[in-house]
Structure formats: C-alpha cells, structure tokens
Amino acid sequence: MLLLGILLLIFNPFHKSPDERALSELGFIKGTCNDSDASTATPDSECLALRAKPTMTASQVAAALPHLKNSDRKIELNLGGTQIDNLDSLKGLDDLESLDLTNTPVWNIDALKEMHSLKRLVLHRTDVENIAALKGLTGLQSLNLWDTRVSNLDALKNLRDLRELDLRDTQVRDLNPLEDLPHLETLKLGGARNVRNVDALSQLSSLQTLDLNETQVDSISELKKLRGLQALYLANTPLRDIDALKGMSSLRTLVLDGSKVDDIDAAQGMLQLNTLVLARTQVTNIDALKGLTGLQRLNLADTRVENIEALTDLKSLRMLNLFRTRVRNIEPLRGLTGLQELYLANTPVEDVDALKGLTGLRELVLYGTQVRNVDDLKAALPKTRIVW
C-alpha cells in the first residue's frame, strides 16, 4: 500500500499544490507545455498547461481564475471544443502565454486587450470577425485565425514579433498590414479566396513557408526577393508564370497542382528541392528537373508529360506519380533503386521489365495499363504490393 501511495503521488498530475488539485476538480486536465519558440517541451517547473474538458462552463473558468493567478509559472490554457463564448472571466490573468479557443462560440475578444504576456493565440473556427483587441499585444509570436470571419488585418501592423500567422479560409484581401513583420517565418493564406495581390509580402525577409493554395494569386513576381523561402504552396491558383522562383536555391517544397503553370524552367538548379507537385498543370516538358538530385517526391499526375528521361539520375526519388500521363517508356526508372512508391495507373505503359531491379518498391499501381508481364514482375518483386 505504501508503494502504491508513492506511485500515485508521483504520477498524479495535480499533486504539486492545492491550487492544481482545485483546477482538476473544476474540470481541467494537465498537459505538456510547449516552448513558444520551438516544438520542445518546457519543464513543468516553468509552465502549467491546462486543457478544459468539453463540458467546461464560463462559471467554472471564473472559479478557476484565483487558482490560476496563484501560479508562479507561465500558463498555457486550452479551452478548445467547449461552449465558452465569453472571455471576461480571463481578465487579469497576467501570466497567460498561450490560449487556444478552437471551435468555441467566442466572437468578442476585447477581454484579451491587456494580456501582454500572450505569445500564442488560436482562434480557429470561432465566430471572431474583429481583431482590433490584438493591436497592443506586441509579444504575440503565433496567431491562428484559420476559418474565421476576419477580413481586416490592420491590428497586426505593429505585432513585429509574429513568427507564425494562419489566415486560411478567411475573408482577408489586403495584405499591406503584414509588410513590416520582420520575424514572420510561416504565413498560411490557403483558401483565402479574396487574396490576389501578394506584393506586400516582398519585404518579409524571414519568411520560410508561404501557403497561397486556393487563392486568386496570378503573379508572384515580387516574391523573387524571398531568397530564404523553403516551402511554397500555389495549388489551384490562376498562376501561369513562375520565373520569379529562379535562383531560389533554398526551396525544398514547391506545390503547383491545379495551377495554370506550363513551364518549369525556373526549377533548374533548385538542388535543395525535396518535393515537387505538378499534378493537373499544363506542363509537358520536365527537362528542368535534370540534376535535381535531392528530389524525393514528384507528382506529375494528370499532365501531358510523355518523356521522363530527365529522371534517369534522380537517385533520391522515393515517390513518383505518373497517374494518367502519356508516359509509355519507363526505361529511365531502371536505376532508381530508392523508389518506394510508383503510380503508373491509366498510362500507355506496356513493358515494366525496367522495374524488376527496384527491390525497394513498397507499392506499384498499374491498373488501367496494358502491362502484360505482371507475373514476372511479381516474382522479381515479392515484397512489393502490386495493384493492377
């Protein structure tokens, strides 16, 4: 019994103080803190992470406030999934560094005006439209407004410490308020269908990840200054010209599927490129990919590509999607022994002898082809899942 008591004391997440026990009784579950500057865990001695049960009410949050104020640690509070719609009970919580309100009926965030300790705020899937209350929160480093009604970003002009900003599926149109955010590293605008002009982003020298999927962006000429960009997403946009990307040697991920792009010469020399998605584009010539020895994932599905000789020496390729292309000759793949996934469905391919030495293949999709020697291929690749 003594041993059991000791174990319970050690593993009980709220054994440290009466305040934490009270918080547990009110419906809070203790979690793991994350460093605001990284993905590493922060010691419990420095941080208190609390997640509310879905049944949490505003009155319970109000009752928790005195106990939260007694903490000498920074606080990360997750109220996501609750029915809390009023934040007044949080006023005076000076040590709050992270607040997650995902999928709550919150619409008014005026109660956050004086929370200058906030570094991370998540308003994903709330009814928030007006974010004027944030204009003085200059310590904010991460702000998530995904799937909200927000359209005006003026309040963000002076939040110069922002590192991450998620504006996906918002009503945002004017990006000028973002032009002077020197530390912004990640900007997500996917699904913000009113966005057309991204010239204001040209001065964001720290930007590493930019998501413009499902926007109306048709020109990226001003983005040529973003030499530190590592990931760029432009799926399902009216974009045709990617010449601005020439010389962007830091790019690791480039997603263009469903765009109007037909020329990828700008990809020449992108030696760091790891993932390239060209599905459903007008691309027919992939010679620009010669020499991109770092490429691991290439998607050419639903294009008119016919010749894949440019892939002959791309030994790092792990996934290749040629679904519904015009490729007939796959001899250039013979030496790509690192391939793990190969999709050849609905192509004119007939001869697959070139694949017999690719013993690392985990999945090979051949349905909709005229391949005749599948039995021989199965014998040569006993560990490969072949779908045909």
At which residue positions do the language-model features occur?
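Hydrophobic membrane-insertion alpha-helices, especially the h-region
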Residues: 1-10
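Concave beta-strand-loop units of leucine-rich repeat
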Residues: 31-37, 45-63, 72-89, 95-111, ...
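Intrinsic disorder/low-structure terminal segments
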Residues: 10-13, 27, 92, 322
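Charge-rich, solvent-exposed alpha-helical interaction surfaces
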Residues: 22-25, 63-67
